[in-house]
Structure formats: structure tokens, C-alpha cells
């Protein structure tokens, strides 16, 4: 009986973790709303959007002459 419970638990954990990995959609838009003049480069020339996002960075190629792969804004936490 105990072995069945362990196998069931392992199965549930494996299925749960794989479904969470598929749901990652990148950083939220508000963290990537960095003004062009404040962008800090996070990549290298010719980096793809996918490679940039995999580094935990934002990608926006709509503005020339500024970094397209850049560090996101820091998520702030309210403390009282």
C-alpha cells in the first residue's frame, strides 16, 4: 500500500511540474516598459527574441539605435 502512495505522489508531482513549465509566457508587460534612454543592455548583437527572454530579459526591436534586449524593471515590494 505504501509503495502505491509513493508512486502516485511521484506521478502527480511529475505531471504538475511539466504543466507549469508549459505555461511560462515571459515577463509581464509592465516590467518591460523601460524608456529607451534607460535601457540596460542584456544581450549581444544578433540575439533572437527567444534567446533574450530565456535570459530573463525583455526584447523590443521597435526602436532603432537602442538595446533591443534589455534588463527589465525591478519588481518592487511594498513594506510597511
UniProtKB/Swiss-Prot annotation:
Query: Which cysteines are cross-linked by disulfides?
Result: 32-58, 42-57, 52-69
Any one cellular component term from GO for this entry? secretory granule
Name the predominant localization: secreted
Q: What is this protein called?
A: Trefoil factor 3
**Taxonomic source organism:** Felis catus
Which residues does UniProt assign to the signal peptide? 1-21
- What Gene Ontology terms for biological process does this UniProt record contain? maintenance of gastrointestinal epithelium; regulation of glucose metabolic process
Localisation? Secreted, Extracellular space, Extracellular matrix; Cytoplasm
Assembly and partners are described as: Monomer. Homodimer; disulfide-linked.
* Location of the P-type domain: 30-73
Q: Do you know which Gene3D superfamilies this protein is assigned to?
A: Spasmolytic Protein, domain 1 (4.10.110.10)
Keyword field = Cytoplasm, Disulfide bond, Extracellular matrix, Secreted, Signal
Citing just one GO molecular function, the answer is: identical protein binding
PROSITE patterns for this protein: P_TREFOIL_1 (PS00025), P_TREFOIL_2 (PS51448)
UniProt-listed InterPro entries: P_trefoil_chordata, P_trefoil_CS, P_trefoil_dom, P_trefoil_dom_sf
Its job: Involved in the maintenance and repair of the intestinal mucosa. Promotes the mobility of epithelial cells in healing processes (motogen).
List the gene name: TFF3
Tell me the organism's taxonomic lineage: Eukaryota, Metazoa, Chordata, Craniata, Vertebrata
Any one Pfam family here would be Trefoil
Q: Has keyword Cytoplasm?
A: yes
Q: Which domain of life is it from?
A: Eukaryota
Amino acid at each position: 500500500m505504501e509503495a502505491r502512495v509513493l508512486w502516485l505522489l511521484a506521478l502527480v508531482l511529475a505531471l504538475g511540474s511539466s504543466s507549469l513549465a508549459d505555461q511560462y509566457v515571459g515577463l509581464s508587460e509592465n516590467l518591460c516598459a523601460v524608456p529607451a534612454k534607460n535601457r540596460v543592455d542584456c544581450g549581444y548583437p544578433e540575439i533572437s527574441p527567444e534567446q533574450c527572454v530565456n535570459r530573463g530579459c525583455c526584447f523590443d526591436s521597435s526602436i532603432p539605435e537602442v538595446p533591443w534586449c534589455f534588463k527589465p524593471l525591478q519588481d518592487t515590494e511594498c513594506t510597511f
